[in-house]
């Protein structure tokens, strides 16, 4: 596609809660424990993609449009009901929260590779990552013309069939597609298909669809928003306090300070199980109800966890 489509594309992110839940839970913990921390981080394209001309300009325009977002009373009411573990002061903070386009700036080099630099307080920029990734993903489909060829009816059928396969075979599943989606509409279609499949086959399924990471879509379909934390929380602490040695210990302590026993599934593998095990005391093992396996062989990791406990 030609550069002149930049500037004509509608706003991609239209709701403050069109984001993954764990960005809000981590933002709350960061504000509570590290309100003055300054961060700098960079977008990395693992595939070294060459983006169309004008792509970075449109990314910047879409980031600028985020400044218009304001959390609504309906969004806050939903989160207070479903995300009861988030302290009420956080919603007061969110009522006054506004994005600033200066926190993230995109550019392209002469070869067309995309660069995005994030700068600012951790408490503020933490709510940009997933939204910016969703913008990049959707714009890529628009700029390459793939979005115009998308068959939404077929996609619904495929999503419904996938849900049926998992649910009929006893799987417990949730949807985590915000940063990877081809568009907000396609993610909504996928979540809707999973919801409908679960409802239509309620007497036959042995599995369950427990929710989505996307808070806005959870509100739209009245399901549970899913998520606790990302590696970012542990790695950010490691960056501030001298590396991985005590990062898990401090992350668990700060998480407990904010959530007082709620949200007790800990993401342990930022620096591997052995480093985590050095920091996981008996009190931590008793207070965190579960561990999230996010790397390595699941069975091998599960055996390590069982032996440790």
Which residue stretches match the model-derived regions?
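Glycine- and Gly-Pro-enriched alpha-helical subdomains that act as flexible
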Residues: 224-304, 308-309
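Ordered alpha/beta subdomains of enzyme catalytic regions
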Residues: 1-251, 256-258, 282
């Amino acid at each position: 596609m030609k550069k002149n489509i930049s500037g004509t594309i509608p706003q991609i992110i239209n709701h403050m809660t069109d984001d993954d839940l764990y960005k809000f839970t981590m933002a709350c913990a960061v504000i509570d424990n590290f309100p003055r921390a300054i961060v700098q981080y960079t977008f990395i394209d693992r595939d070294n993609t060459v983006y169309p001309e004008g792509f970075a300009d449109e990314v910047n325009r879409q980031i600028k449009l985020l400044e218009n977002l304001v959390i609504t009373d309906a969004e806050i009411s939903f989160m207070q009901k479903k995300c009861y573990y988030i302290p009420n002061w956080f919603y007061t903070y969110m009522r006054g929260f506004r994005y600033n386009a200066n926190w993230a700036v995109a550019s392209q080099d002469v070869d067309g590779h995309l660069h995005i630099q994030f700068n600012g307080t951790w408490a503020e920029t933490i709510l940009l990552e997933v939204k910016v990734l969703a913008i990049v993903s959707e714009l890529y489909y628009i700029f390459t013309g793939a979005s115009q060829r998308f068959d939404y009816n077929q996609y619904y059928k495929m999503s419904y069939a996938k849900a049926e396969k998992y649910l009929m075979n006893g799987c417990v599943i949730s949807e985590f597609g915000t940063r990877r989606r081809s568009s907000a509409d396609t993610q909504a279609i996928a979540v809707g298909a999973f919801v409908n499949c679960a409802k239509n086959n309620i007497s036959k399924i042995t599995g369950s669809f427990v929710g989505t990471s996307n808070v806005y879509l959870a509100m739209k379909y009245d399901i549970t928003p899913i998520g606790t934390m990302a590696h970012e929380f542990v790695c950010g602490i490691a960056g501030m306090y001298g590396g991985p040695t005590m990062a898990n210990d401090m992350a668990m302590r700060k998480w407990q300070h904010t959530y007082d026993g709620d949200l007790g599934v800990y993401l342990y593998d930022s620096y591997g199980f052995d480093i985590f095990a050095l920091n996981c005391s008996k009190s931590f093992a008793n207070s965190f109800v579960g561990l999230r396996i996010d790397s390595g062989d699941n069975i091998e990791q599960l055996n390590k966890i069982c032996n440790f406990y």
